Amino acid sequence: MTPEVMTAENTRIVVDTSSNVPDALLARYRMLEVPTLVIFGQDSFRNKHELSEQDFYAKMAASKVLPTTSQPPPAYFADAYRQAFDEGAEHVMVVTVTSKLSGTFRSAQMAAQEFGVDRFTLWDSN
């Protein structure tokens, strides 16, 4: 259920790693970050979790094939939502890369259904 008044104390913000929110801001505003996938050939990595920025550029320099990306599966969003609610959030605001470029927004929507969509504000950044 959506709280009558959304505050910093009862609301958590969830973003995907394509937003490139600096770590200091993620920490300051207690944001949770869902990793997009970076794919080099047959190898898939969770952006910023299994592949640092330095590792990304090193792999790119060493690879003959350019990397691609993929949307996070709904389970990654569900994990972030579960963490937010376990830590006391009453409401979750989700901001994703535009649905015109990625299926990330759809993954966020699908995961929200597990918890009751009235507990969410989902914002497609298009």
Place the predicted regions along the sequence by residue.
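Short beta-strand segments
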Residues: 15, 94-98, 124
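Short Gly/Thr/Asp-enriched flexible loops that form oxyanion-binding sites at enzyme active sites
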Residues: 96-119
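Conserved beta-strand scaffold positions in the cores of enzyme catalytic domains, especially
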Residues: 33, 94, 120-122
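Glycine-rich phosphate/diphosphate-binding loops that line cofactor/substrate pockets in enzymes
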Residues: 4-7, 79-90
